[in-house]
Amino acid sequence: MKPTKLILSICLTFTLFSCESPAEDTPVHGSSGTYILNSGNWGDNDANIGFYNPTEKSFAADAFYAANGQKLGDVGQDILVYDDLVYVAINTSQTIFVTDSDLKIKKQLDAEADGARLSPRVFAAHGNKVYVTYYEGYLGEISKDYSLRLCAVGPNPDGVAIAGDNLYVANSGGMSYPTYNNTVSVVSTDSFTEASTIEVNVNPAMVAASSDGKYVYISSFGNYADQPAKLQVITTSNAGVTDLEYQSVSAIAKGKNDVLYILCGGYDENWNPLPGTIYKHDMKTNSPLGAFVTDGTTLPNSYSISVAADGYIYVGCSDYKTTGDVYVFSKEGKLHDKFDSQGLNPIKAF
């Protein structure tokens, strides 16, 4: 396929490439279930998507390849289902796939700014728009016609969430070790410009907002030395930032009824990973709800946490060497299933 180059007039100069790709009739997505995105290993071009059915406890591996006859790419970063379409960010391959529910490619979106390709990271969606962070310092807004606007934010933006009429973008500065960034950009959804920045802990990563827009939660990795990982909350009415009392936070995920699931990990004195622990937090009242797992299940090499539309909580476990395991929990904190993701580093369930 030869991409078509579209030159658009926006607040910043950039280029968007779009590819359409028909596929044979190979449906992989049932009436209910969850996509599992395996990030893969950097440089190995081995990201993939499988489909898990929690009712049948069945898993169809590499469903994207089955639908399209091509590999997904290098380092799968995020997956979003919105308005009957699936969006997949492939970071190192610097592309976004837009597919139907069976993972058949409808569009492939490659963005440029100032003559350089951009690397997509994390999605959010609101008001018929899909937003995506680009690691080169931009937030993108994708419209239904696949046109794209860009807004310059801070260095190496990662997570993004919507609270009220604003987008909150975590500027990690992840490529500037050991002098990481420590800001969150506040971007208006109306003007699509950066309105302000808020200082937080260094190396901010994931963002989640309460449904009433009152609170925005930010997890950060710290500098891996004297500044530890943290979970903080921004009160949007006054941009105040408060530390929450969770230790070694590695990932967060917003669930139903404004419950925030907090995955905490860490290492022993010999740098061996400790089993993950999950806590719950009420996002609307900003109050702890205690431990999540109620049946004693342990989570070795915990890597990621997601809450899917099916209501189950998915925890990806990975040693970065062999195929990962995914633990599936009910909202009551009991293990529903465990399966081999048949890929490296299961990073997201949706």
Named regions from a protein language model:
Residues 5, 20-350:
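Predominantly soluble domains enriched in secretory-pathway, periplasmic, or organellar proteins
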Residues 1-7:
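Bacterial N-terminal signal peptides that target proteins for export
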Residues 15-18:
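C-terminal motif of bacterial Sec signal peptides marking the signal peptidase cleavage site
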